Amino acid sequence: MSKSLKSEIEAADDRRYQAMLDCDWGALSAGFGDDLLYTHGSALTDNKHQYVENVKAKYRLKSAKREDVTVRGYGDIAIMHGRVRMEMDADGKPRSMHNCFAAVWAKRDGQWRLIHFQPTPVPAT
């Protein structure tokens, strides 16, 4: 894994989380490919518009911390894998999440854009 590629993908992902922290829905949307598929831990899948509207209506992110991240590059595609711990308000109630995730990023017009994300809840131990 190239340190440069990992840094680029982590920076793009940092911008995504910062947009959610700032409730900057335009910035959040801009970091996604128009073909985004976001498959939730519940198996429900959102497209880009559905996901942004869902986050805007239901969630207020308070913190997010990635762990154990790996990034593999395949030309203009990068696959990111790791874990993330998040604190948020979901439908007005505090919620903690610890997920393992897989994310697919595509480089388009010189920018890395998220095109697929799938979190899986990590069981409590």
What is each residue range found by the language model?
Residues 1-30, 35-125:
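A beta-strand edge to alpha-helix "cap/lid" segment located at domain peripheries
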